[in-house]
Structures are given as structure tokens and as C-alpha cells.
Regions:
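Active-site lid/adjacent beta-loop-alpha segment flanking the redox-cofactor pocket in flavoenzymes
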Residues: 65, 242-355
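Glycine-rich FAD pyrophosphate-binding loop
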Residues: 35-55
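Helical element adjacent to the flavin cofactor pocket in flavoenzyme catalytic cores
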Residues: 151-198, 202-207, 211-212, 216
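Central helical "cap/lid" subdomain
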Residues: 50, 198-250, 277-284, 297-302, ...
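N-terminal Rossmann-like FAD-binding beta1-loop-alpha1 element of flavoenzymes
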Residues: 15-42
Length: 416
């Protein structure tokens, strides 16, 4: 029992929501709400959707495994299953999505990966989910020479994120408002009003969802969601007859895709310190050098290297996304301050939240895999449909979790 993570039963006057941000997170929650009969106004400051962190030509959808079963592994496994099933359903319904479930090989390129491989091999997991391969089997599956064994995920693959986002929002219930920057939000008379750069109201609704990536803290004066920003750049390589033999995604410290739209996509850099958000030749060289270290024979087949896409991806200190309601910080500070004394949960009141305000973000580089499940859970929360089996995961993703940790340490949050 964790009353600070409990959600109320919502009673909405209208089933209309505003979502800020049309990357994969914003498009996913818009789609999930539309499936529940909501209308959605989706605000995007760029000229088109999926231009920032979701702007790569190709991105990977795959699980993330640990040597021993863990909460993190369970989350990524569940999210992977959800995303691949969602894609199968969308494609069966006629959606135009560039999804290539060609499989992924995570190379045993260092001691840590080798130890993980050995542990996974001993767990005898289902072969349609995971296989442990030696270097010969890896080379056969990849279609190119590999010096390493690998963990093979046959249902993984790569996708064009923009095509995924576009398919999600091609619903009559969703209205895209592009080239409009949401500068501020205000709440009055049970409505959230979103103001643009001129101060005008561009949309309003009882429910507002912040899905604006690195900018979510721009709209939450009373709470700061801890985020770690990382600049990542992907690179492109022109395919040749030799390089086009690659049949599946290769994972090492980065990733490499088979040829797609006359490019191999590989990368990505991981820079915690940066001054500008832009592609650079230096980052291309770093990506290329890393690829040469693990796949030298394949690299010898490639001639021309080009810059791909650079963007800031934000993750959280515990690497789990945020999916849930925005807490009332003053209420938490007043009613949960005694957590530092170790009082039992039964003595605390149910949590209080900012009315109708929700957040979905902090996906890092794995938003294509995890955003669907997180959006589904957030939609369940908004629609009073939380299943008992999902409660523990919702607690893990709760936007107030770092606030609670702060209060347990006896530190009161700054309240504006």
C-alpha cells in the first residue's frame, strides 16, 4: 500500500484532451485516448511530427535483458511485447508503417555482454523470443561475417519513427496543430489553457498531457521532474552490394541497420555535455570508429558516410519513464514529510494531484519500444481502468517517485 502513488477516480465533464508534443510519446497517448473515445488536440511546434528525439530515419525496437530476472527486464520485455503486437494490429488494419521485424543480434563484444549471454543461455528462455548464438550462427543470421556470438531477438527490428507516429495520429478524433509553440499553461474554471508565443489561447481542455520531451519542466512551476539530457547523433552510410548483405539489426555499443531508403543507419553518440544541438563530422567519425571496431569486414564494404540526425534525448535517474499524473507538491510536502521518520503507509492520506494534468516522458533512446505500454497505462489511469496487475508498474513509473524519495531523506521540495 502506497497512498502517495494512489490515483483518484476521475470524473471528466468532457472526453477531450490536449497533448503537447508530437513525438512518439505524444502520438502514442493521443492514439490510446482516441481508442477510448476521446478527442485530442495535439500541439507541435515544428512543421511536422517526429522531428526532435523521434526524428531518426530508422530506430530499433528490441527488449533489454539482464543476466538475472529483474524489474527492469520485466518492464522492457512487457513493453517490447506490447509494441510489436500494437504494430501487428495497426498493419493488419491497413496502416502504412515502415516496420521491418528482421531480428536483432546483440553482439557479445565485451566481457559484460559475454557474461550476460552465458546467464541468458542458462535460463532457457523461449526460442521465439531469444536465442544465444555462437559466432558462426551469428554470421549466418546477419548475412555478414561477425567475430562474436550474440543474443538474438527474432521478433525485434527497425522502424521509421515518422511513419509510426503518422499512422498513430491518422484518426478522426485527433487534430494536429503544427507550427505552434506552447509557451505557457494556465488552469482556471476546470480548464487548462495553452498559450502560444503571442499569449493567445491555442487550445483548452479539462485534461492536459505533457509529452514534450526535454521541455516538460517548462510547464511545471511547482515541481521539477529530474531528467538527464543526452545529445545523440546517428549517422548514415551509402549501401554497396557487399554491405547490403546485412539482413538484421546489429547491436554493440551502438546499433546498425540493414539498408533502408538507400542508407544504413548507425550510431549513436551519447554526449552528456554539449553546447549546440546539431550534426557534426566529429560525431560521424566517432560512430564510424566504433563500428569499425566491432564489424571491420563489413565496414570495408562501405564507401560514403553522411550525417544523420542529432537530438537531445532525456532519461530519468532510475532509467524508468514518467507516466502518470503531476503531483500537488505542496500537498506532498505537507502530508508526507513524516516519511523521514518511517511512519507506516496506513497513516497517510491518499495523494493529491494538479487537476487534469499528466506527464509522459523520460524515455531516453528506447521510446519506440516503451512508449506504447506507458501510454496505455496512462490512458488506463485517465479512464479509471487501472488493472491490479499493472499497479506495481504504475508505481515504478509514477511522476512523484523522486519527490517521495526526497521526502524520505528529509528534504522538503522548493514550492513556488
Amino acid at each position: 500500500m502506497s497512498p502517495w502513488f494512489d490515483y483518484p477516480r476521475y470524473q471528466w465533464q468532457q472526453r477531450h484532451a490536449v497533448v503537447i508534443g508530437a513525438g512518439i510519446a505524444g502520438c502514442q497517448i493521443s492514439w490510446h485516448l482516441a481508442q477510448q473515445g476521446w478527442t485530442v488536440s495535439l500541439i507541435e511546434r515544428e512543421t511536422d511530427i517526429a522531428r526532435q528525439a523521434s526524428g531518426n530515419l530508422a530506430g530499433v525496437i528490441s527488449p533489454k535483458m539482464t543476466a538475472k530476472p529483474s524489474t527492469g527486464e520485466q518492464f522492457y520485455h512487457q513493453a517490447f511485447d506490447y509494441s510489436t503486437q500494437q504494430l501487428a494490429d495497426l498493419l493488419a488494419a491497413g496502416a502504412d508503417i515502415d516496420w521491418h521485424p528482421c531480428g536483432m543480434l546483440q553482439l557479445n563484444h565485451n566481457e559484460r555482454e559475454q557474461q550476460r549471454w552465458e546467464a541468458l543461455r542458462d535460463r532457457n528462455l523461449p526460442a521465439d523470443f531469444l536465442q544465444c548464438t555462437d559466432s558462426e550462427q551469428t554470421s549466418q543470421l546477419a548475412g555478414i561475417h561477425c567475430d562474436y556470438g550474440a543474443t538474438y531477438f527474432p521478433r525485434a527490428g527497425f522502424i521509421n519513427p515518422a511513419s509510426f507516429c503518422r499512422a498513430l495520429i491518422q484518426q478522426p478524433e485527433i487534430t494536429l496543430i503544427s507550427q505552434v509553440e506552447a509557451m505557457s499553461i494556465a488552469h482556471d474554471d476546470k480548464q487548462w489553457r495553452i498559450h502560444d508565443t503571442d499569449g493567445g489561447v491555442v487550445a483548452q481542455a479539462e485534461v492536459l498531457i505533457l509529452a514534450s520531451g526535454k521541455d516538460i519542466n517548462q510547464f511545471t512551476d511547482s515541481i521539477v521532474f529530474p531528467q538527464l539530457g543526452v545529445l545523440g547523433q546517428s549517422s548514415h552510410a551509402m549501401p554497396t552490394q557487399g554491405s547490403s548483405a546485412l539482413k538484421c539489426v546489429i547491436g554493440h555499443e551502438g546499433y546498425l541497420t540493414p539498408a533502408y531508403q538507400s542508407q544504413h543507419v548507425f550510431g549513436a553518440t551519447f554526449d552528456r555535455e554539449f553546447e549546440v544541438i546539431a550534426v557534426s563530422d566529429t560525431s560521424d567519425q566517432r560512430n564510424w570508429q566504433q563500428l569499425q571496431e566491432y564489424l571491420p569486414e563489413w565496414c570495408a564494404e562501405v564507401a560514403e558516410i553522411n550525417s544523420g540526425h542529432a537530438a537531445v534525448r532525456t532519461t530519468t535517474p532510475d532509467r524508468y519513464p514518467y507516466a502518470g499524473a503531476v503531483p500537488d507538491t505542496a500537498f506532498y510536502a505537507e502530508h508526507y514529510a513524516a516519511l523521514k521518520h518511517g511512519r507506516t503507509a496506513e497513516t497517510y492520506p491518499q495523494a493529491s494531484y494538479q487537476p487534469g494534468l499528466f506527464v509522459l516522458g523520460g524515455f531516453g533512446s528506447r521510446g519506440l519500444t516503451t512508449s506504447g505500454l506507458c501510454a496505455k497505462l496512462l490512458s488506463d489511469c485517465i479512464n479509471n481502468q487501472i488493472a491490479d496487475k499493472d499497479q506495481a508498474l504504475l508505481n515504478t513509473l509514477h511522476p512523484a517517485r523522486f519527490l517521495i524519495r526526497q521526502l524520505r531523506r528529509g528534504k522538503l521540495p522548493a514550492i513556488s
